[in-house]
Amino acid sequence: MPVGVVLAFLAYASFSVADALIKTTGPALSVFEIAFFTTTFSIIPAMLTKRGERWRDMYKLEHPWLVHLRCLTAISGTACVMYAFTHIQFAEVYAIGFTTPLFVTLLSVLLLREHVALHRWVLLFISFLGVVLVIRPGMRALETGHFVMMAGAVLGAITTTILRHVAPKERRVSLVGLQVLYSAIVNAVLMLPDFVVPTPAQLGVLLGIGLLGGMGGLLLIQASRQTPANLIAPVQYSQLIWAILFGALFFNEYPDWIAIVGMLVVVGAGLLNVLTERPRIRWKPRIFFFRIGQ
C-alpha cells in the first residue's frame, strides 16, 4: 500500500476521532464556543512545522472579496456541521456531508463553466439517492439537525468552489491564516451570550479536537505530496466506517439496514465518481473541509 494512502487513512481517522469528541462536548458547550477553541488549537501543529511563507504576507490578496467570502461561508458551514454532530446520528452527518460533491459540481457548471460528463451526473444523482435512503424524508420525522447539515453541505460546496478558483493565485498562508483569524473573531463574539467557562476536562477535550484536526490536515497534505490524488480521495469514505463504529460504541446509535444500504450506495457512487475523474492538480480538502478551511 502506498505511503500516501496510509497517511490518508491516519488523517481521516484523526478527523473522525475529533468529530466524535465534538459530539461528546456539544451538549455542554455552544457550537460557537467549540469552534472558537478547536480552530484556535488546530493551528498549533502547523505552527510547529516549517513554513514556506511569511505570516506578514497573509493580507496580500489577489481576490480579496472572494477570499473574505470564503472565510464567512467556511465559518457558517462549521457552525452547521458542529450543530448537526450534536443533534443527529454520527453516521447521518457524514452521509449528508457526502452530498457536497453534488453541489460542488452544480456550482462548477454554473459559476466556473466547467464541463461535466454525463456519467458523473448519473453517479452524483445515485449518491444523492443513497442519502435519501439514509435519512428517508417523508417516512420519518426529520430533525432540525438534518436540515442544518444539508445547509452545511451547500456552504461547504460554496467554500470549495471559491477555493478552487482562488487557490492557484493566493498564498496558502492567506487562505489558512485569514480563515483562522475570521473564525477566532466571529466565534468569539457569537459565543459570548451563552459562554460557559470550560472545565479542565472540557478544555482538554477541546485541545484534543484541535490537535487532531490540525494533525489530520498536515497528514493529508503530506499524503497528497507522496501519492496521486486519485488514490487518496477514495480514503475519505473510511469516515463512514468510523462513524458507524463510534456511533455504536459510544453513542448507542445503530443505523438500520436501509440506512446501511444507503451508505453503501453513497460510498459506491462516490468511489466510482473519484476513480473515473480525470486526474488534475487541485486542492482536495477533506469531507469536513469547510470547518477550518484546510
Label each region the model flagged:
Residues M1-G4, F36, Y59-H63, R136-L155, ...:
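Juxtamembrane helix-entry segments on the extracytoplasmic side of multipass membrane proteins
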